[in-house]
């Protein structure tokens, strides 16, 4: 789908690379048709996860090595994607060439969040808006919390799921806990270039952000910032941290939704009822 292949997508939070040199980005393969991995060497890069020799996958899950070696014929690559060596090819002429290196994909990092794509465009305006609104959050210090991960498959077109996310009229009837935690009458929606922001104002007694004076939301009892970035990325910020929701089309009437949790170290003890799950 062109609308997905030509846009930026969430790859990972840098905390997912803690202690690892490479992690497989399996969720992006279903979106983009390209096996990718995120590597941490002298810098964080998104590179192809396919060996340039015979197409074998290089990393299954994650690894912690200074080089990447193909498990099929032993071709070895650096963490910058460059081919380093291959058994029995020491005397080969004009080898290796640039064609033997792994493809490097565009990537952008913002406050610990890494985004990538095939030939993406248009994320800068979204990040500029988010920086102005929530740049005060220590998102780069959030820690990956595997226990908050979820995965659902639904019988619906991906756009129908996005439509459901973007309208709040169903909240009093479907999300009882969320409706109790938020002041429904003060629910706010703002549109910006490439996305939508919904702001949940807390009911009395609910956990809220400590918002600094320089923020446009100073003085508000904000319980959640819900960002949708076109076409299928949701970044839901709560006082406890961040829930990333990925919308992954499987067919015209099947969609997989993946949730990934990243927790602020000062709120690891909290579980709030403001999650927006299916």
Which residues does each predicted region cover?
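Signature of the catalytic double-stranded beta-helix
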Residues: 1-7, 11-12
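Rieske [2Fe-2S] iron-sulfur-binding domain
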Residues: 17-120, 124, 128-131
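Predominantly a Rossmann-like dinucleotide-binding segment in NAD(P)-dependent oxidoreductases
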Residues: 111-152, 156-162
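A conserved active-site cap/scaffold subdomain adjacent to cofactor or substrate pockets
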Residues: 146-185
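Polyanion-binding catalytic cores of nucleic-acid enzymes and NTP/SAM-utilizing transferases
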Residues: 178-217
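C-terminal structural cap/anchor segments
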Residues: 218-260
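Acidic, proline/serine/threonine- and glycine-rich low-complexity intrinsically disordered segments
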Residues: 264-266
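Conserved small/polar residues in nucleotide/adenosyl-binding loops
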Residues: 268-274
């Amino acid at each position: 789908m062109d609308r997905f292949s030509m846009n930026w997508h969430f790859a990972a939070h840098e905390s997912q690379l803690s202690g690892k040199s490479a992690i497989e980005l399996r969720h992006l393969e279903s979106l983009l048709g390209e096996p990718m991995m995120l590597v941490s060497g002298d810098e964080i890069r998104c590179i192809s996860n396919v060996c340039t020799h015979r197409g074998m996958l290089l990393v299954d899950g994650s690894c912690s090595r200074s080089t990447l070696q193909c498990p099929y014929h032993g071709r070895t690559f650096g963490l910058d994607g460059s081919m380093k060596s291959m058994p029995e090819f020491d005397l080969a002429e004009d080898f290796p060439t640039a064609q033997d290196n792994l493809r490097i994909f565009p990537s952008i990092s913002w406050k610990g969040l890494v985004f990538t794509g095939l030939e993406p465009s248009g994320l800068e305006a979204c990040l500029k808006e988010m920086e102005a609104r929530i740049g005060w959050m220590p998102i780069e210090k959030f820690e990956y919390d595997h226990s908050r991960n979820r995965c659902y498959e639904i019988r619906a077109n991906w756009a129908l799921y996005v439509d459901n996310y973007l309208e709040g009229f169903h909240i009093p009837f479907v999300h009882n806990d969320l409706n109790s935690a938020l002041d429904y009458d003060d629910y706010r929606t703002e549109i910006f270039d490439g996305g939508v922001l919904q702001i949940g104002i807390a009911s009395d007694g609910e956990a809220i952000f400590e918002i600094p004076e320089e923020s446009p939301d100073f003085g508000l009892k904000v319980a959640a910032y819900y960002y949708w970035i076109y076409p299928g990325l949701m970044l839901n910020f709560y006082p406890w941290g961040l829930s990333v929701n990925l919308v992954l089309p499987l067919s015209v009437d099947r969609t997989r939704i993946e949730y990934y949790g990243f927790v602020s170290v000062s709120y690891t003890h909290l579980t709030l009822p403001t999650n927006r799950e299916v």
